[in-house]
Amino acid sequence: MRNGSLVGALLLAAGCSSGGGPAQPEGEGGSGATVGSGGSGAQTSGAGGAGGAGGASCAEFAMPTDVDCAAPLDGVLPVDLRCTGLYGNFDQREIACGVLEYKPAVELWSDGAKKRRFVSIPKGQQVDTSNPDAFIYPEGTQFWKEFSVTGAGGAQRLAETRLLRKTAAGWVYTSYVWSEDEKQAIQMQNDFGVTDLYGTGHTVPNRDQCQECHVGRADYVLGWDALMLGSGAQGLSAETLVELGVIADASNLALTIPGNEVERQALGYLHANCGVSCHNDLPEAAAHDTGLYLRLEASELGEVMATDAARTAINKRPAENAKYEGLTNPDPANWYDIRPGDPSRSLLVARQVLRGFEGQMPRIGTHKVDETGVEVVSRWIQEMKETYPPPGP
């Protein structure tokens, strides 16, 4: 089904009316899927009754009466984005009171899409941050991520808004696809996602792809941890969350990535883009069986060589199930996950620049190479000198 026809059919099925103009993104790819079960689109109170996104003016959320806010028969989230509690005034794209906007210290690569992120914690509830590596969220927590991409004529347009909500039975998640005129955002209700949305090249992931990334995190949320709320974060920090009453104590969250600037940039990039979701030691993580772990843990931040990224990658041969199709040299004997001083024989870099093959990294959600990310990781490997092991043969 063509993208326009698909979204049009969803709009018609939802009984939705038109109205409102496009949002103005301030930043830079689940569809109808559920984990467990839970209630429908209930209103949330927000983080302790705090103001709107980024401290801006806000409007109180009220369940709209001009659209059907019921969840589809096979789901628990409402069909229309307006019913989720993100906007106090949808027509003006005014964020609801208690919804907080944030930007993590390191952003996940999404083919250059501009993103805005929002969170709502139920009033009177707190996030358990006693384990800085694994935050636990209260029931009713909601995270939204809005994607804007380059459309016809080079102008930015809204593509999708993803939602994660924690229910009594677990996390539920979906993606709301914006109509071509950007006046409505309706929940994806197929199992396939959308490829090349409105000719922009943007892909809305299918439900399996959403789960593949998020199950690699203890409580499902990516991009919200001690490091991502630390140096470089915008909108929210651990300290501001204490002030808002969202967390009780930030004393164990003052973590710093080890090393010089080059090392910190590379380790932070690999943590956010590879380690948080897939390359970590959680049994559910998609790349757990590779033995290549790139997530930064609080207990290993004393020095670079103590990190999983260094211990499991430097001078390590790739896993037996590694994919080499599409590489200029497909001989496994040529490769190390990281070969100090030699990005050209480091499979980590080769996968970063690979696209269109199973071995590309990130494996899903991207069709374009992150040139900046490649440069960051390559420079780290190139500068591995005195304090690093000598390169393997």
Task: Give residue spans per PLM region.
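Conserved small-residue
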Residues: 61-131, 137-139, 144-151, 157-188
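Ser/Thr-rich, Pro/Gly/Ala-heavy low-complexity intrinsically disordered linkers and tails
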Residues: 1-3, 7-63, 392-393
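Sequence context surrounding c-type heme c attachment/ligation sites in exported
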Residues: 57-70, 134, 153-326, 330-393
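Glycine-centered flexibility sites
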Residues: 39, 49-52, 140, 341, ...
